[in-house]
């Protein structure tokens, strides 16, 4: 099992809203710290609800498409 803290977040992109679990690595304390890491081009969500109707086990979202992120 991966180490870190699982956080439920809402990610709003240009075309969709995703609500899913994001794993914050142990060396990071905040969601924003993990998302803003330079080498990271995508963020991964698990147990995802897409636009309040569709479900997916996993989604990778290109950071360049993200408009906002909020912890739930």
Give the residues covered by each predicted segment.
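Conserved RNA-binding domains used in RNP assembly and mRNA/RNA metabolism
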Residues: 1-72
